From Swiss-Prot:
Cellular-component GO terms for this entry: cytoplasm
InterPro entries: Aldolase_TIM, DeoC, DeoC/FbaB/LacD_aldolase, DeoC_typeI
Single annotated GO MF: deoxyribose-phosphate aldolase activity
Name used for this protein in its record: Deoxyribose-phosphate aldolase
Function: Catalyzes a reversible aldol reaction between acetaldehyde and D-glyceraldehyde 3-phosphate to generate 2-deoxy-D-ribose 5-phosphate.
SUPFAM superfamilies: Aldolase
Species of provenance: Listeria innocua serovar 6a (strain ATCC BAA-680 / CLIP 11262)
Catalytic activity: 2-deoxy-D-ribose 5-phosphate = D-glyceraldehyde 3-phosphate + acetaldehyde
Matching Gene3D superfamilies: Aldolase class I
Length: 223
């Protein structure tokens, strides 16, 4: 598998414009990225632009705080699927995890998994920068129990992004059959190679073109 086919080509900033989405989808077609990862408002346009392409549309749920109710997250998933999303990256209820309310954390994830079942792949963002190692392990275990397809490090909108150490811990926790996505601060081919070596099977990056072409990103970006 090429590096491009492991990358979710990402544009999640609040000021993202239509022109930027059109560029993102054009690049996805050109380079063969796994997906474009966009905010829900851009799912329909992205799906139209990628009609017939190998790249699919990924969107974010409960993003970036994870503090919506399970019911709202489930509705977001259904709406995104109606608009053409094939993958959804949800943020867990981080406060509930820290409160050790594992039942709520699981119910929250399961609401998304159930809404997406048979229609979209689910990635669960645990926001590693806000968690202890014990909490990272627990979050991954709950996500697997709830039926996720992937666990994912970060939103790119908090205090830190992906590290090889966190990827290795997540991979060890979920085993070989669940995907692990590294996101947040992955900007170069070298960054990607470190993440893959640690166990990542998907990369979230806004610098996808720079990564596959070996160029430096135009400017630093958290995502």
């Amino acid at each position: 598998m090429t590096i491009a086919k492991m990358i979710d080509h990402t544009a999640l900033k609040p000021d993202t414009t239509k022109e930027q989405i059109l560029t993102l989808t054009k690049e996805a077609r050109e380079y063969g990225f796994a997906s474009v990862c966009v905010n829900p408002t851009w799912v329909k346009l992205s799906a139209e632009q990628l009609s017939g392409a190998e790249s699919v549309v990924c969107t974010v749920i409960g993003f970036p705080l994870g503090a919506n109710t399970p019911e709202v997250k489930a509705f977001e998933v259904k709406n995104a699927i109606e608009n053409g999303a094939k993958e959804v990256d949800m943020v867990i209820n981080i406060g509930a995890l820290k409160d050790k309310d594992d039942e709520l954390v699981e119910r929250d994830i399961r609401a998304v998994v159930d809404a997406a079942k048979g229609k979209a792949l689910v990635k669960v963002i645990i926001e590693t920068c806000l968690l202890t190692d014990e909490e990272k392990v627990r979050a991954c275990e709950i996500a697997v129990k709830a039926g996720t397809d992937f666990v994912k490090t970060s939103t790119g909108f908090s205090t830190g992004g992906a590290t090889a150490e966190d990827i290795a811990l997540m991979r060890k926790t979920v085993g070989p059959n669940i995907g692990v996505k590294a996101s947040g601060g992955v900007r170069t081919k070298e960054d990607v190679e470190k993440m893959i070596e640690a166990g990542a099977t998907r990369i979230g990056a806004s610098a996808g073109v720079a990564i596959v072409s070996g160029e430096k990103p135009a400017k630093p970006d958290n995502y």
